[in-house]
């Protein structure tokens, strides 16, 4: 039995002028979420969704590609200005930020919202390579 083709509706354009870019850069991956000022998601992307697998997800180039993809989707909804919130210790922080700036967004502020433990949980042991 043949399956019926499912029609996927394209999301309606929201026309939002300002947004917040949340760049979450871990040691293994980089995720970019662009939301409106209230925090409702407009677009998102990650190094994994861009087709990178394994250790290639943690590269600055993968973060740049993910930021360009999320930025392109956000521009379809009319986003022009961004506040950037960077979180995490990963290598994709700066390259994702540069990619958003190169995509034509007017970046108004950059905040580092990495949570810092006040002597909380014990960190993972040091790697011996």
Swiss-Prot record:
Its protein name is: Small ribosomal subunit protein uS11
What molecular functions are annotated in GO for this chain? Answer: rRNA binding; structural constituent of ribosome
Which organism encodes this protein?
Answer: Roseobacter denitrificans (strain ATCC 33942 / OCh 114)
Write one Pfam family the protein is assigned to: Ribosomal_S11
Q: Which PANTHER family match?
A: 40S RIBOSOMAL PROTEIN S14/30S RIBOSOMAL PROTEIN S11
Q: How does it assemble?
A: Part of the 30S ribosomal subunit. Interacts with proteins S7 and S18. Binds to IF-3.
Q: Name one GO biological process term.
A: translation
Q: Kindly state which keywords UniProt assigns to this record, in alphabetical order.
A: Ribonucleoprotein, Ribosomal protein, RNA-binding, rRNA-binding
Q: Which InterPro entries does the record match to this protein?
A: Ribosomal_uS11, Ribosomal_uS11_bac-type, Ribosomal_uS11_CS, Ribosomal_uS11_sf
Which family does the record assign?
Answer: Belongs to the universal ribosomal protein uS11 family.
Q: Identify the GO cellular component terms for this protein.
A: ribonucleoprotein complex; ribosome
Q: Which PROSITE patterns match?
A: RIBOSOMAL_S11 (PS00054)
Protein function: Located on the platform of the 30S subunit, it bridges several disparate RNA helices of the 16S rRNA. Forms part of the Shine-Dalgarno cleft in the 70S ribosome.
């Amino acid at each position: 039995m043949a399956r019926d083709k499912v029609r996927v509706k394209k999301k309606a354009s929201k026309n939002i002028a300002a947004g917040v870019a949340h760049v979450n850069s871990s040691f293994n991956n980089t995720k970019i979420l662009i939301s409106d000022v209230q925090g409702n998601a407009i677009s998102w992307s990650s190094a994994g969704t861009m087709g990178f697998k394994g250790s290639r997800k943690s590269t600055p180039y993968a973060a740049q590609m993910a930021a360009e993809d999320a930025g392109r989707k956000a521009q379809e909804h009319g986003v022009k200005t961004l506040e950037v919130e960077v979180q995490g210790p990963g290598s994709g922080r700066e390259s994702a930020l540069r990619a958003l700036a190169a995509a034509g967004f007017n970046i108004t502020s950059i905040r580092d919202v990495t949570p810092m433990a006040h002597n909380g949980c014990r960190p993972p042991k040091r790697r011996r390579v």
